[in-house]
């Protein structure tokens, strides 16, 4: 189920910047892009509709975490936008995860966030009062996500093999924190290259700045895509 296209994180604050960026690509190129909280909260559903109108796939990364009824009804609204993938927080619990699935329906891919790739084990213990290892926490959340019949999880590429050994076949792992060889790792703490992520079993990878801030974003995208698929 591996997606051949790297997902481009559209970490822009405005509609105009998104339009300008997407206009760099050939009209017949079908991208897979991520809309995060900043962009969605700034521009609302119209930004999703616009990107879908261009024929691109949309990963709407809102990381919902609320009471089950609220998550269920919100997912029902999001499903009407024609999104291809979205997220919830695994920490919301199995009941909330199941409610999300019910609200979203069976079309879009629904994945749960385990631990953010910016989170270190020390931070997890101090801030979340979770005294296990980081990988144990991630694996626990992944198993609960599978139990709730979601499609997969967001996790570091370093955790993919451990997760896939413990969950049903077909359970997907989306990995942010991907950086081309030699690139600045930014605020990510657990990173891999696209080729390493493929070798370890990642199904989807997400990159932002290595593409969006490149001198030639189209060239950077195709170089990363080639590395991901070799």
UniProtKB/Swiss-Prot annotation:
Keyword Lyase carried by entry: yes
Enzyme Commission designation: 4.1.1.23
Annotated Gene Ontology cellular component terms: cytosol
Short name of one Pfam family: OMPdecase
Molecular function in Gene Ontology: orotidine-5'-phosphate decarboxylase activity
One annotated GO biological process: 'de novo' UMP biosynthetic process
Residues annotated for substrate binding in this entry: 11, 34, 61-70, 117, 179, 188, 208-209
Keywords from the named record: Decarboxylase, Lyase, Pyrimidine biosynthesis
Active site (catalytic residues): 63 (proton donor)
InterPro entries: Aldolase_TIM, OMPdecase, OMPdecase_AS, OMPdecase_bac, OMPdeCOase_dom, RibuloseP-bd_barrel
Keyword flag Oxidoreductase: no
Pathway: Pyrimidine metabolism; UMP biosynthesis via de novo pathway; UMP from orotate: step 2/2
Cited PANTHER family: OROTIDINE 5'-PHOSPHATE DECARBOXYLASE (PTHR32119:SF2)
Subunit structure: Homodimer.
Protein name (Swiss-Prot/TrEMBL): Orotidine 5'-phosphate decarboxylase
Gene: pyrF
